[in-house]
């Protein structure tokens, strides 16, 4: 993993090993990216693959997602896995709204991304109809390696995000387009 944080020699007269010269955005982004707490919202077979992803063989904890949260108020990464019916959509939205900022969403699998094989009146054809999605993980169901890759892509996005992006007019406009306050 590359980082924009550089360790340089201390100026003369300053004691110690050295000091960091970097931007606040880089430090906060690095800390956020490597300490994400996932909230699994699993309704189908992708949830089984998530269990394998969290197990010792794939070990998502290596990437800073060690503590799985089952409370939206303590999570910052919502992982939606499986089919979401239209009756379940308001619940998914409520879970998203209960998460504190900054919050990110990964749509895991074909069902969460586009409705999958369930092209019917009762199934939501992609969770991006009710909440904003940051990363899509394809597959039916996706292998644990793909889920890990999706988390790593989200980490890259988080690292590059400005500290103040979440209070920007563009982000507020995005939330307003979903009717989220």
Swiss-Prot record:
EC number: 7.1.1.-
Primary location class: membrane
Residue numbers binding [4Fe-4S] cluster: 45-46, 111, 140
Cofactor note: Binds 1 [4Fe-4S] cluster.
Subcellular location: Cell inner membrane
Membrane topology classification: Peripheral membrane protein
Keyword Transport: yes
GO molecular function terms noted in the UniProt entry: 4 iron, 4 sulfur cluster binding; iron ion binding; NADH dehydrogenase (ubiquinone) activity; NADH:ubiquinone reductase (non-electrogenic) activity; quinone binding
Gene Ontology biological process terms in this record: aerobic respiration; electron transport coupled proton transport
Any Pfam family: Oxidored_q6
Signal peptide extent: none
GO CC terms in record: plasma membrane; respiratory chain complex I
Sorted UniProt keywords: 4Fe-4S, Cell inner membrane, Cell membrane, Iron, Iron-sulfur, Membrane, Metal-binding, NAD, Quinone, Translocase, Transport
Cofactor(s) this protein requires: [4Fe-4S] cluster
InterPro entries for this protein: NADH_UbQ_OxRdtase-like_20kDa (IPR006137), NADH_UQ_OxRdtase_20Kd_su (IPR006138)
Taxonomic superkingdom: Bacteria
Catalytic activity: a quinone + NADH + 5 H(+)(in) = a quinol + NAD(+) + 4 H(+)(out)
Function as written in the Swiss-Prot or TrEMBL entry: NDH-1 shuttles electrons from NADH, via FMN and iron-sulfur (Fe-S) centers, to quinones in the respiratory chain. The immediate electron acceptor for the enzyme in this species is believed to be a menaquinone. Couples the redox reaction to proton translocation (for every two electrons transferred, four hydrogen ions are translocated across the cytoplasmic membrane), and thus conserves the redox energy in a proton gradient.
Assembly notes: NDH-1 is composed of 14 different subunits. Subunits NuoB, C, D, E, F, and G constitute the peripheral sector of the complex.
Family: Belongs to the complex I 20 kDa subunit family.
Protein name: NADH-quinone oxidoreductase subunit B
Species: Flavobacterium psychrophilum (strain ATCC 49511 / DSM 21280 / CIP 103535 / JIP02/86)
High-level lineage: Bacteria, Pseudomonadati, Bacteroidota, Flavobacteriia, Flavobacteriales
Gene: nuoB
